[in-house]
Design a protein with these regions (language model features):
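Conserved alpha-helical substructure of the radical SAM core
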Residues: 2-117, 121-122, 328, 332
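Short, acidic/turn-prone active-site loops that include or flank metal/cofactor-
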Residues: 34, 108-109, 130-134, 321
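Conserved residues at the C-terminal ends of beta-strands
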Residues: 48, 78, 129, 197, ...
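Flexible, active-site-proximal loop/turn residues at the rims of small-molecule/cofactor binding pockets
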Residues: 51, 81, 132, 200, ...
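Generic structural signal for helix capping and beta-alpha/helix-loop junctions
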Residues: 52, 84, 112, 135, ...
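Radical SAM enzyme [4Fe-4S]-AdoMet core and its adjacent flexible, acidic
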Residues: 58, 68, 98, 122, ...
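Accessory C-terminal segments flanking Radical SAM cores
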Residues: 231-331
């Protein structure tokens, strides 16, 4: 089974509940950035995400309120670096009590401190950032030794009984051969899930490491072939989309983002505006416009946070797609 059964059943119940209520749009994942403080300055990250003052972090109460307001069954704790957040352990506890499934996204540098304070739980996944093998990952993180630390923390997390997965961004220079080498390593360690995302131009960053549409299609055509050999978390229909074999509208409301600046609209990557309240965010963003991908910043986007929800949203339109997804979830 690709995901734990409770994740699948929670998602199904949430979708059925919203459809019964007649809700056309509803979030499935809360991307919670409790702080913009980080111990790295990775090349794919905008400055505001790693230069924030820890004193400007969200309070524990604000984080819990975001959980309750969005109602999303999945919580992704990102940032910034979440393991720096002083209230991380009680935040995870509060999310578990609300029967959310938590992905703790981390670079791994301070993960051993979290392990000392927390305990494994079926509703908690440790999601370690790994953008390739040693040379590539340390280059992306702009610091030597980060790869070795991440791998050590993956080993330790697994030995302690945590569910550990990884998150990888593919850049222009990244070879698919290296991605497969990384997958071989992670599989040998016992990692059960690997999320792969294309790095693309969405902001005016001083880097040319991001890919455009043609480059994304070429690399993800090869990554699609790897999905039969390794436990890739991306759905097969999303990988076909990233490979240029099918089209989807965006679903920016599927993964909503709460930050120290407010609710980020329209999506995780594009900060057109920050809203002080959930109600203002949910009712003010022009979802129709952003779904159509007409904005210039959306042209090269194949981000899983925008299009995995689209896969689910459009799934009922094809029996073949439903069968593909059923095999992927229950027979792999």
């Amino acid at each position: 089974m690709r995901f734990p059964m409770h994740v699948t059943t929670d998602m199904m119940r949430w979708q059925i509940k919203n459809k019964i209520k007649g809700n056309k749009r509803f979030p499935v994942v809360l991307m919670l950035e409790p702080l913009y403080t980080c111990n790295l300055a990775c090349l794919g990250c905008t400055p505001e995400r790693h230069t924030g003052d820890i004193r400007n972090r969200l309070s524990l109460e604000q984080c819990i309120a975001a959980l309750d307001e969005s109602g999303a069954p999945v919580l992704s704790i990102c940032g910034g670096e979440p393991t720096i957040y002083p209230e991380l352990v009680p935040l995870v506890k509060a999310a578990v009590e609300r029967k959310r499934h938590i992905y703790l996204c981390t670079n791994g540098i301070l993960l051993d401190r979290f392990f000392e304070k927390a305990k494994p739980h079926p509703r908690l996944s440790i999601n370690v950032h790994l953008d390739g093998m040693r040379d590539t990952h340390d280059f992306v993180c702009d610091r030597d030794g980060v790869f070795d630390k991440a791998v050590a923390m993956i080993r330790k997390g697994l030995s302690l009984g945590y569910h550990v997965c990884t998150n990888t961004t593919v850049f222009k220079e990244t070879s698919v051969e290296e991605i497969e080498e990384m997958m071989q390593l992670l599989t040998s360690l016992g990692v059960k899930g690997m999320l792969i995302s294309p790095g693309y131009h969405y902001e005016k960053l001083s880097t040319d490491h991001f890919m455009f549409r043609k480059e994304i299609h070429e690399k993800f055509t090869k990554i699609l072939a790897l999905a039969a050999k390794y436990p890739i978390y991306n759905t097969p229909l999303f990988l076909e989309f990233a490979a240029g074999r099918r089209e989807y509208p965006c679903t920016p409301w599927g993964n909503v983002t709460r930050t120290p600046l407010g609710w980020k609209g329209p999506c995780y990557l594009i900060g057109e505006k920050y809203y002080p309240t959930w109600e203002e965010f949910w009712t003010s963003v022009d979802w129709d416009y952003w779904e159509r991908r007409e904005d210039e910043r959306c042209q090269n986007c194949f981000m899983h946070s925008g299009f995995e929800p689209s896969v689910v949203r459009k799934l009922g339109e094809s029996w073949g797609d439903m069968w593909t997804m059923a095999k992927w979830q229950f027979m792999s």
